[in-house]
Amino acid sequence: MTPPRLQQTARLDSRGLAKVLGDLEAKVMSAVWKTSSPASAREIHERIVRHHPVKLLTVVTVLNKLVAKRLLKRSAIDGLLRYTARQTRAEFDAYASRRLVEGVLGFSRDLVAASLVDVLAETDPEALEELSRLVKARLREQKRR
């Protein structure tokens, strides 16, 4: 499968998906992931407009951009264009997380690793324990090779 095309910069001041997608792109992707079957632009718009005032044409434009970025598939079903995600939310999160980490590690591996440990220690000690477990497991795996 061809990977999606994400922007080359992360928006550190944004939350969740909006770190790697635009704000409206993130809302559209969330709406698509919440549908269990291919959805029309109107159906996606109806989900978004409840919480975010936006025109249908704007949603159509964003859907087309997400198709170009290989995040969505577009197909004609019963004469209507319908959209589905190319990846599950979990698959996308894993891909985007890896891309973010690869980009950040290009800055300064040692400082990034130390900062990650410090931030987890301050904000989520359980996640720090999980990171420690993952590191130990990976080191054992590498020694066996």
Give the ranges of each region predicted by the language model:
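Short alpha-helical segments that sit at the start of domains
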Residues: 2-29
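Short capping segments at the starts of secondary-structure elements
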Residues: 21, 33-40
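Short, cationic-aromatic polyanion-contact patches
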Residues: 21-24, 77-96
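Short amphipathic alpha-helical elements of helix-turn-helix/winged-helix folds
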Residues: 27, 31-35, 47
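Short acidic, hydrophobic short linear motifs in intrinsically disordered regions
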Residues: 38-48
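Short, hydrophobic-biased segments on the C-terminal half of alpha helices
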Residues: 60-64
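Glycine-centered, phosphate/nucleic-acid-interacting loop/turn motifs that mediate DNA/RNA or nucleotide
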Residues: 70
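Amphipathic alpha-helical dimerization/coiled-coil segments
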Residues: 95-140
